[in-house]
């Protein structure tokens, strides 16, 4: 029987085969006509790739059927080298959680009155405390500095 093989260039080859012929035999006949080695050939019929050991009748290939020839692509992407670091990774700073830290800002006296231990920023308002640097007070929010009088 006669089958057609359509190549990548759009050229159609006619082959004389039997339904009992294997895909290997068909590929060797294509090699004789086109010079493409069988290990680089992929034959497609009805959207399926044809395996080498099977016969034409296994795929229900009848007379005047058209097979599509595509070339096999070898390999994949180039392997990338793993980065080697010369210095060890910097250890991330871990926040130390202090339980009941708010007790450091206020003091309760014997009479039950609450007194602030730190000064509040006059620019930022209540709740923003100034850092005490001995000779001066500093606001971390608005970056104001207040000098203490001696």
From Swiss-Prot:
A GO molecular function held by the record: zinc ion binding
Lineage, highest ranks first: Eukaryota, Fungi, Dikarya, Ascomycota, Saccharomycotina
Pfam families with a match to the protein in the record: Ribosomal_S27 (PF01599), ubiquitin (PF00240)
Organism: Kluyveromyces lactis (strain ATCC 8585 / CBS 2359 / DSM 70799 / NBRC 1267 / NRRL Y-1140 / WM37)
ZnF locations on chain (C4-type): 121-142
Keyword Cytoplasm: yes
Gene from which this protein is expressed: ubi3
Crosslink feature (Glycyl lysine isopeptide (Gly-Lys) (interchain with K-? in acceptor proteins)) location: 76
InterPro entries assigned to the protein according to its UniProt record, in alphabetical order: Ribosomal_eS31, Ribosomal_eS31_euk-type_sf, Ribosomal_zn-bd, Ubiquitin-like_dom, Ubiquitin-like_domsf, Ubiquitin_CS, Ubiquitin_dom, Ubiquitin_ubiquitin-like
Cross-linked sites for Glycyl lysine isopeptide (Lys-Gly) (interchain with G-Cter in ubiquitin): 6, 11, 27, 29, 33, 48, 63
Protein's name in the database: Ubiquitin-ribosomal protein eS31 fusion protein
Keywords: Cytoplasm, Isopeptide bond, Metal-binding, Nucleus, Ribonucleoprotein, Ribosomal protein, Ubl conjugation, Zinc, Zinc-finger
All residue ranges annotated as the Ubiquitin-like domain in the record: 1-76
């Amino acid at each position: 029987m006669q089958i057609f093989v359509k190549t990548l260039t759009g050229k159609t080859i006619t082959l004389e085969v039997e339904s009992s012929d294997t895909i290997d035999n068909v590929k060797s006949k294509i090699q004789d006509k086109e010079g493409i080695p069988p290990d680089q050939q992929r034959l497609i019929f009805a959207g399926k790739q044809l395996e080498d050991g099977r016969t034409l009748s296994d795929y229900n290939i009848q007379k005047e059927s058209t097979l599509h020839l595509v070339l096999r692509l070898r390999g994949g992407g180039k392997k990338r080298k793993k980065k080697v670091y010369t210095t060890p990774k910097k250890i991330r700073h871990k926040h130390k959680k202090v339980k009941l830290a708010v007790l450091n800002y206020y003091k309760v006296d014997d009479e039950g009155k609450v007194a602030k231990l730190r000064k509040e920023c006059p620019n930022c308002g209540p709740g923003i405390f100034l850092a005490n640097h001995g000779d001066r007070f500093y606001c971390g929010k608005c970056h104001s500095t207040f000098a203490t009088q001696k």
